[in-house]
Amino acid sequence: MKNQKTSLRRQPQQQRSQKRVEQILDAAAIIFDQVSFEAATTHTIASQAKTAVGSLYQFFPDKLAIFNALELRHVERVRIMWDKLFRPEIIQLPFVNFIHTLVTQVEELFEQPTSRIVFRQF
């Protein structure tokens, strides 16, 4: 995720560190979705990610920084969705088909915990 650099305390250099950051973000999205941002703790996020809480703190100073990284992930997914929808072959569909395609894409986006929790917080 290219915008992630702005939300990380330390930039992961190795592939396994990048994978750990993704695991932390995936776990945080699940935990925030299940219990809410307010009720979530960095310890439960680390446990869900199957990593030590110290590893989490290497990359994120607190759960707000994790949430901010999830916001960036969501924004990138929305951008990708719009790029798909505004291809000429989609725009030229009959209106009903275009709306169906749009609704389907938005449903798929919000099936992901990241998008649900970002939306709920606002």
Named regions from a protein language model:
Residues 1-19:
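N-terminal intrinsically disordered/low-complexity leader segments
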Residues 19-28, 45, 70-81:
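Generic hydrophobic, amphipathic alpha-helix propensity
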Residues 23, 31-65:
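Helix-turn-helix
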Residues 69, 84-111:
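Hydrophobic alpha-helical connector segments
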Residues 88, 121-122:
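Short, Lys/Arg-rich amphipathic alpha-helical interaction segments
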